[in-house]
Amino acid sequence: IGNVQPLWVIDGAIYEDLVHLSLDQLASGDAVTLISSAISGLNPTDIQDIQVLKDASATSVYGARALNGVIVITTKSGMRDTPLRVSYSTENTIRLKPRYNDFDLLNSQETMSLYQEMNDKGYFGITNSLYGRRSGIYYQLYKDLSTINPATGEYYLPNTPEARMNFLRQREYANTNWFDHLFTLKPITNHAITISGGGKNSATYASIGFYNDAGWTIADKVSRFTANVKNTFYISDKFTATLTTQANVRSQKAPGTMPQRKNNTLGVFERDFDINPFSYALGTSRTLRPYNEDGSLEYYRNNWAPFNIFNEYDNNKMNISMLDFKVQGEGTYRL
């Protein structure tokens, strides 16, 4: 599927996306989607009107680029012969954590019952568990059975039926709530100050805004500062000139990601080392634990390597900093 992005028109000027993406790419979660938006620096407080053009009139005005539709945004302007007005607005939002009750997923006891049946049929042998591409509690079991603790000179786990049973019982009742570990109740705050007014020959609209999302998950956060000044000059009864200056600074943190690829044989999309918090919480067994009893990180096997999601978030991340500055002029002459 080719490019399906609409054409953005803000105050008469066409805004191009930094990166043109297909529909599959837009939904991919790839890193490029975080820098592709043409309007990411536009403060919603500054928007006066939004129109969506989807018919033939869109292409007649804007050409072939408008085949996917046109979104026309008009920003606020100061009004002529009005007193100076200063306003402040704020918005604060808290998002709830996802819950396992909203999904039909196995708890740790149900998962362990399935694991034990598979183990009885020979699916969790020592070779596959220790050296396979992915392995969970049985990787940990065989690793502890075969690794000597340097502090004691003995194996981490004695090779006895009682020790094995105790190890598996701990995992059976772990019932790890990955949503609780990976998601937060941190707020989203949005502040905006606007100034508007005008005299006989000019009008001004100005705004500054600060947006801060402390992160719905432990792996992401974003903050943005915007500034906008729009001056309108009434040079004569027929001629009007407008000068708009916009600036925004964005700082963002996100979990690292590998490009998504399609498996045509299975008809599914795949991604190596996918650490998206929501996908991870949904797809990870609740028999696994994030920490050992001593508070250290507990690792299992993923893509042939020891893996812990918190270690990944500490070391596999994206820090994005963007500065955008725009100056736009417009002249209108009435016949």
Where are the language model's segments positioned?
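N-terminal periplasmic accessory domains that precede
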Residues: 9-11, 60, 66-90, 170, ...
